């Protein structure tokens, strides 16, 4: 996400930290449509704060069907990742993880990763875990009624 005051505190510490930024879109305008926090901590300022970290940063990028998975998105993400020397973790949106949104099909995720790699960006497609028991990232928050959520 990029909470800038927290990033600055971590960067000032003597320990070395690996920073992962929840990016989810390659431009500020596209990111705002997905992540309202862009209003408070805009992408430019987040990336400026990230420059203080001495270790390689990672961009976390949840693939949302029709929202951030076009060839143009891949090209813009590749340029951004290349500029900042970032690793890109691609994560398919979990079914039911966000109302009204659909995951990018797996073949399109692979093609997106290939497009990044062809442009010199290290991109990794992360495997979803916990889907079989409806406990993947973003799924537990939506649980209501009987089940684990009330415990």
Task: Report the location of each language-model feature.
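Conserved AdoMet/S-adenosylmethionine-binding subsite of the radical SAM
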Residues: 1-124
């Amino acid at each position: 996400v990029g909470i800038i005051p927290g990033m600055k505190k971590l960067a000032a510490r003597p320990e070395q930290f690996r920073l992962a930024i929840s990016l989810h879109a390659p431009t500020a305008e596209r990111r705002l449509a997905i992540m309202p926090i862009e209003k408070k901590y805009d992408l430019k300022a987040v990336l400026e704060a990230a420059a203080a970290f001495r270790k390689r940063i990672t961009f976390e990028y949840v693939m949302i069907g029709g929202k951030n998975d076009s060839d143009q998105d891949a090209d813009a993400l590749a340029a951004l990742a290349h500029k900042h020397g970032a690793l890109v973790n691609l994560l398919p949106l979990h079914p039911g993880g966000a109302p009204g949104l659909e995951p990018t099909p797996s073949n399109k995720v692979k093609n997106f990763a290939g497009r990044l790699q062809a442009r010199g960006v290290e991109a990794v497609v992360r495997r979803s875990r916990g889907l079989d028991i409806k406990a993947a990232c973003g799924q537990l928050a939506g649980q209501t009624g009987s089940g684990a959520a009330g415990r």
